[in-house]
Each structure stands twice: as structure tokens, then as C-alpha cells.
Amino acid sequence: MSDTARLSVDIGGTFTDVALDVGGRMFTNKVLTTPQAPEEGVMAGVRAVLPEAGITAADLAFIVHGTTLATNTIIERKGAHTALIATDGFRDAVEMGYEHRFDQYDINIEKPAPLVPRYLRLPVRERCNATGEILLPLVEDDVRALVPILREQQIESVAITLIHAYANDKHERRVAEILQAELPELWITLSSEVCPEIREYERTSTACANAYVQPLMASYLADLDARLRAEGAQCPLFMMTSGGGLTTVETARRHPIRLVESGPAGGAILAGRIALECGLDKVLSYDMGGTTAKICLIDEGRPQTSRTFEVDRQYRFTKGSGLPLRIPVIEMVEIGAGGGSIAQVDNLGRIQVGPESAGSEPGPACYGQGGTGATVTDADVALGRISPDGFAGGSVQLSPELSQAALDKAIAQKLNLDGPLAAFAVSEMVEENMSNAARVHAVEQGKELAARTLIAFGGAAPLHACRMAEKLGMDRVIIPTGAGVGSAIGFLAAPVSYDVVRSRYSRLAHFEPEGLNKMFTEMHDEAQAIVASGAPGAALEERRIAYMRYIGQGHEIVVEVPARALVEADGAVLRAAYDEAYEALFGREIASMEVEILTWALSVSTIAPPPPRQTDIPEAAAASASGERKLFDADLTDFVMAPVYQRDDLTPGMTVQGPA
């Protein structure tokens, strides 16, 4: 086993990306994703990249994996047969959801269906209050009466979500003990473990989602681990989480819901490291793959994080129309605009792109695998942006004729456009959609865009980055080496980490550091034990945050908490930090209002070495073209002959005169 060979694999909707770092030398590969058996694509990518580096699986010291399997399982509703056990009177909280409508003007609004149907939402009598005081002891006979029902319904997995279990988990644990004794093969999720936070709907939804995907994810992880071992790998396997850290397979088996947005998190980490290398304070990360595009604001090299995420939105990108999850996640906006997104003309004669995707099977029309829809990739091929012979490292041969035929049928004939203009129109629409998403995201975060640098990666982002930067008023674009597998490269820079969250209501006017210090000690011990199991002996760092708001508000903002023993004076420190954060977001503070804290979070992670800073770029000769081909020029709205340059031939300081 080598100490320097590290491998990462990112499964996307269209391609599975592999990155291998051997002593600082990077080897990459892309293979088509195999949706029916994702591990097949993983193994194909691994077998393709190892010989390039001249090593075997036995030489690997580290493997990290990110996957969309959990997300797809929820969206496609292909998870386990799941039941929910809830406090009597509260089993419908997961279906009632929020009191407000995400679209108040649509009288035919469709809410996302719960993962657990009503006949499998089973009540038990018990009750705790918000402070954890037991008002009604658990009626254990109610739990035992559920056993034959669970057997009869052939339930594979159960979510246990009792009212106020975040404050006292005694009843949830007792329910689990009774069920485990009677049904030892049953998968059990406790809401007090996966989401020990206030807010009943989100906690229940998160627990149900974890239970829904757990059997499938556990089976997949066990199978993948066995396949890697059979290939000769002897090193540990880590999973990328949605919060931007790595975790062990065992932890991922218990909390698979934390893997939901693992792929995009790797891209944000890559962009953050590039920002630090280049000395950039503010950047916009732009990751466009085969199925979706992700946009993330990064300040001081650190992506913004959140505790909320929605999956399976019923209305295109409408907040509130999906299933809410309370998990650590990197804050980003995601739209269904990838290389495989299908373009069509709607009833009003407008070009719409996505969210439907051709995926990897059958793929865009130019793949020649039976796909007939006109996709963004087909438009890029028709515009001369993609070499038909060099796509995915030459592993996929493209057909420009099939691209043009699909565009003619879907767009050109319906809008009376010639072929190139139809392709250009598709490209313009997808770039405008992404630019609008970036603008809205920046406004929601109280951030500006014009002064930022755009970092573009993913299989499709570099093709659209310059036009998108122009629309956003940005004057610098960075396309890193290995951009096509950017998320997989980002995995290799991620720390081993774990986040612990606790809901503990506190008012700053009555700040109690003793109780908080005890809570933080317990949280630290829990997180450190998990991180140490994956990185024994490694130096660790700790970060604490509080979710704060003015009394009476319905949303919180994140404030850093000193990672040390708190004292009474820290109440004033937190108040000042909150006022500053609130003013940055909303343009003012409200000094007369009292501040409260609902939730506290602590993360422990290994310390990633800082990336080397880029020194002054030396002057170099002009780059030499390897050839030329026809390229559609947006300003001329016509084709021009443009030089072609190989990315590997470009060295720091070289210049290229466009269009190229």
C-alpha cells in the first residue's frame, strides 16, 4: 500500500468521474453512469484509471466516494417499505407540513407526498413537553401491538419520531428496544439521532427519509466495499457528506440521509481551495454536469453552510415544494440545467430547457444510443464547442449530424430558425436560466456578484462560463485543471468531519454558560469519537455555531460561537456578532429587540493543510494551437474558424487570443 495514492469517485446523473492523486500527479477518467447498478460504473472507472498511473488497487491508501443514489431513491420513490411511529395525535404532521402555501395563487397546488403513507403511520401513547419533562409515560403495550402490523405489512424500515424527542429521547429509545427484540432484522431510525432539533415537520420528514433510504444505501455500501476489496483494495473507504466533510462507511450506514448532496459539496470544496490558492476573497462556484448546474457563493475560501435542504421539489425550483431535510449542507442553488437537459418549445412558443434530462441512458442524441431529444450537449456540439472525437477523453464518439437533426426537429422547425441559431438559442436560454439563478441566490444571501471571480468546472460549465460571466458583469473566469471531474478532485481535499446539533432554547438576556459548556462537551465527545475512528491520531479543529433570531421571528441566522469554555461576558459577544450579521443581511439592526437561540451546532474535523499560494505568474510565449475548427461566434451570430488548444499544453503565463 502506498502512502500517496488517493482515489475519489463521484457518481453523477450522466457520468461517473474518477480522480487519482499519486504523489501530486493527477489522473482522471470519466465513464457513463450505470443507473441500474451504480457500483458497475464505479468499478469501470477505477479499472480504467489505475493502469494509467501504473498502480493497482492494493497500492491505494485512501478511497472517497460521493453518490446521488440516496437522492435518486427519494425522487424515484424506490426506497424501502417504511413505517412511521409517532406520538398519538401527531402522525399526520408529516403530511400537513407548513401552514403557508409555497404558491398562494395556485388553487390546484400539489404538495409533495410523504414517503410514508397514512396507513403506515402508526401512533403510540406518550408525551413529553418542550423541556423534556415526561407528561405521559410511554404505553409499552401500544408498541408491542404494532409488531404484528409491521410483520403483516412486511415493513423493512421504521422511523420513530415522538413529540419533543430532541429534548428527551428516552421514549424513542425504549420503542426501538422493544421493536428490536421482536424484529431483529428491522432497520430503525430515531429522530433524536438523525435530527435532534426543534420543528416537528422537518424532524419527522428527515427521519422518514433516512429510514426510507437506509436499507438500500447500507446494501450498496456493503456491496461496493466488497467489490473494492475483491479488486485488491485494502485501504479505508470514506463517504462524502452534504456538509463538505468525509465520514466512515459505518456512520454513513446509520445516517445515509447525510449523503444526499455529496457530489456538489466536493465541487464547492475545490472552488474554495482554488480561491485560497489564488488569493481571491470572493468567488462564485459554478458546477455544471450532465443533469444539473450548481451555483455557490464562497467568501474567504469557505463555502456557506446551512441546516436545511429540500429534495424532490414538485414545482421547478420553487422553495417549499419539496420534502424538507434538516442536515448539514453546503448552501447552493441547483437548477435542472446540465449537458443532458432536454430543450423543447412550449405552447407559447418559448424555448424551455430542463429539468428533464436524457441522462446516460439513452443520453443526448449525439451519443448515438437512441436518444432523440435535443439537449444542451447537442447544442454545444452543433456550435462547434465540443470536439466529436475528444469528448470524455475520447471514450465517447459524438455525431454532429444526430445533434443537428434533433435540434431541427425540436426547435428549428417549430420556430422557423436555421440550425446554428436554434442551437445558439438553446445555449442562450440555459445560460440565462443559470445567470438568473445566480442573481436570485446572491440577493437572498445579501451578496453582490460583479466583484467576484467565476470558477467553472464540471463537464459542461467551462463551455458556458464566459457567456454567463458576461451576463453577470464579472470580468474574470477560472477554469481549473481537470475541470471535467472537479467534484471528484474536490473530494480529495475534504477533511474527515462530523457535525452534531442540539436544540436548546436560550435567551441572551438570561445567558447560562455553565449549561451550555456541559452541552458542548457532550457534543464534542460525540463528534470526536466518530472523526477519530476515521482519522486516528490526526490533529483536529472544532467549530461552533448558534442559530439566532429576534424574538418572534420565524427564521434564524448563523453566528459563530467561540470554541472554548463560555463565560457570562460571551452573551454580549454573541449579541454583537448577531447584530452585525443581521445588518449585513437586512441593512439594519433592531437594538431594542431581545435575541433568542434555538439551536446549537458543533463540528469536529481534521485540519486540511493550506493550499500553496500562487506566486506571480511568469511571462511565457503565446500558446501554440493544435488545430482549428468551425466555432459559432455569439457576437457575429455566425461560424468562424477558431484555433484549438490542448489544455495540457498550456503553462502559466501563456496567452490565447479568442475566439478559441
Residue ranges and their predicted role:
Residues L20, N29-Q36, A83-G89, I109-K111, ...:
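Glycine-rich phosphate-binding loop of actin/hexokinase-like ATP-binding domains
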Residues I11, D141-A145, I149, L280, ...:
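C-terminal, non-catalytic interaction/recognition modules in large multi-subunit enzymes and RNPs
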Residues T67, L162-I163, S191-E193, S242-G243, ...:
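Glycine-rich beta-strand-to-loop/alpha-helix junction loops that act as flexible
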Residues T87-F90, I163-A165, E193-C195, S242-G244, ...:
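Short, ordered loop/turn segments at secondary-structure junctions
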Residues M1-A83, N129, L136-V158, E172-E177, ...:
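N-terminal glycine/serine-rich phosphate-binding loop of ATP-dependent small-molecule kinases
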Residues S192-V213, M217-R229, I489-K518, E522-M523:
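Metal-dependent DNA phosphodiester-chemistry modules and their immediately adjacent helices/loops
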Residues D17-A19, T28, L32-Q36, G41, ...:
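Conserved phosphate-binding loops in N-terminal lobes of ATP-dependent enzymes
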Residues S157, T161-A207, A211, D389-F391, ...:
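Terminal amphipathic helices with adjacent charged low-complexity linkers/tails
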